[in-house]
């Protein structure tokens, strides 16, 4: 009788574990979405995106290594330290890509985001989300299904024209925020060496 009761309870435990995992996933996605949405300029948006990407990659890299305290303190931390061989985000990305933890599209998207952020660090110009210098690279990201097409502007009515431009900029920005939220969430929720 006790065995039957335990068998009956097990599916509920699995359900509650799945629900807890789904809630954690949703909470993480919400945090990423909020942080990306807070960036009002292209520069702040990309800085935040690469910071979140770095956090996601760091979680994956740590899964690859042993978990005992001695190994972490004396072997893993020096590798990941700023001047260690895995101190650079690009090197950590290559490691998890080479180990098959992330796929080629995720790897290429991460590298492109880092390159775009680096380019903006050296460029003193402020760009809008709809500038060609931003739309071009974002259009190459695998995580972006499609950027919204530019509307056919009617410059005759200046208030309508301004509204159309603002609406288009917001649509492009929202597409970028949602696409990068999905990319970063997918990477951070991966489990090393599990299919």
Swiss-Prot record:
Pfam families for the chain: MtlR
GO biological process: one example: negative regulation of DNA-templated transcription
InterPro entries: MtlR-like, MtlR-like_sf
Null mutant phenotype: Inactivation of this gene leads to the constitutive expression of the mannitol operon.
UniProt keywords, alphabetically: Repressor, Transcription, Transcription regulation
Entries under SUPFAM superfamilies matching the protein: MtlR-like
Coiled-coil spans in chain: none
SS bonds (residue pairs): none
Gene3D superfamilies per record: Nucleotidyltransferases domain 2 (1.20.120.330)
Record family assignment: Belongs to the MtlR/FumE family.
Oligomer and partners: Homodimer. Can also form higher level multimer aggregates.
PANTHER family: FUMARASE E-RELATED (PTHR37941:SF1)
Function: Involved in the repression of the expression of the mannitol mtlADR operon. Does not bind the operator/promoter regulatory region of this operon. Therefore, seems to belong to a new class of transcription factors in bacteria that may regulate gene expression indirectly, perhaps as a part of a larger transcriptional complex.
Protein name in the entry: Mannitol operon repressor
Organism of origin: Escherichia coli (strain K12)
Native organism taxonomy: Bacteria, Pseudomonadati, Pseudomonadota, Gammaproteobacteria, Enterobacterales
């Amino acid at each position: 009788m006790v065995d039957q009761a335990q068998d009956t309870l097990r599916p509920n435990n699995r359900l509650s574990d799945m629900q807890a995992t789904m809630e954690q996933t949703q909470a993480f996605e919400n945090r990423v979405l909020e942080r990306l949405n807070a960036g009002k300029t292209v520069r702040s948006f990309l800085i935040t995106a690469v910071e979140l990407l770095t956090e996601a990659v760091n979680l994956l890299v740590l899964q690859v290594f042993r978990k005992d305290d001695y190994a972490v303190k004396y072997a893993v931390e020096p590798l990941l330290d700023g001047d260690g061989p895995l101190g650079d985000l690009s090197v950590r990305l290559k490691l998890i890509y080479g180990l098959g933890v992330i796929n080629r599209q995720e790897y290429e998207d991460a590298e492109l985001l880092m390159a775009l952020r680096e380019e903006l660090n050296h460029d003193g110009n402020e760009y809008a989300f709809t500038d060609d210098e931003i739309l071009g690279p974002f259009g190459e990201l695998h995580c972006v299904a499609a950027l919204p097409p530019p509307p056919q502007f009617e410059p005759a009515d200046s208030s309508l024209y301004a509204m159309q431009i603002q609406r288009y900029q917001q649509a492009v920005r929202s597409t970028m925020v949602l696409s990068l939220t999905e990319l970063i969430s997918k990477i951070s929720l991966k489990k090393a060496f599990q299919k």
